């Protein structure tokens, strides 16, 4: 009887150690942010502020790279794309829902393109629309991702498994909320244009653990 109790204790201890050492424990704190990009926003030609976004390149590498490249105007080799988000506008604003942009070809929500061609498939739906600041791909149905995206201003759970979440706002939610509250006209279009005056990539400053190893940059969702 005593031996069985001792064996059960050993098994429980082993499971506990495995749980602590498991990478899934860190994953519970949130997905790894691999890149940081920014938009400098103007409203009616006047500076509104900067939005800094973290991209989840480990979870959705293809989608994150598409956004990073379009934000910088350069591919992974540093070569100019000749197109991207800089100079484009947010064409759709819905209060208590989201702000949408990324159509740099037509500017009205009917255009845009990805770095992989016109459209690319949904990568996965592992990440959810958990609340304000979530960065997700706009689409016209299954596997129709291009360059259009939206930033949530509330939790939008009904979009889970329909739109690919690939990032989160790290700084500048005050700018997002200011954008959310501008006056709009028919079709939810801002009366005065909201434009991305400048965009690019920022370095990630990693923390270092006691062994001198870089700690993955995450945010808790």
UniProtKB/Swiss-Prot annotation:
The keyword Glycoprotein applies. CDD domains: cyclophilin_ABH_like (cd01926). It is an enzyme of class 5 (isomerase). Residues 38-201 form the PPIase cyclophilin-type domain. GO terms for molecular function: cyclosporin A binding; peptidyl-prolyl cis-trans isomerase activity. Residues 1-27 form the signal peptide. It is found in: Endoplasmic reticulum lumen. The keyword Coiled coil does not apply. One of its GO terms (cellular component) is endoplasmic reticulum lumen. It catalyses: [protein]-peptidylproline (omega=180) = [protein]-peptidylproline (omega=0). InterPro entries: Cyclophilin-like_dom_sf, Cyclophilin-type_PPIase_CS, Cyclophilin-type_PPIase_dom. SUPFAM superfamilies: Cyclophilin-like. One of its GO terms (biological process) is protein folding. Keywords: Endoplasmic reticulum, Glycoprotein, Isomerase, Rotamase, Signal. Its main location: endoplasmic reticulum. Its EC number is 5.2.1.8. Gene3D superfamilies: Cyclophilin-like. A motif (Prevents secretion from ER) lies at residues 218-221. It holds the Pfam family Pro_isomerase. Glycans are attached at residue 145. Inhibited by cyclosporin A (CsA). Belongs to the cyclophilin-type PPIase family. PPIase B subfamily. PPIases accelerate the folding of proteins. It catalyzes the cis-trans isomerization of proline imidic peptide bonds in oligopeptides. This is Peptidyl-prolyl cis-trans isomerase B. The lineage of its organism: Eukaryota, Fungi, Dikarya, Basidiomycota, Agaricomycotina. The gene is CPR2.
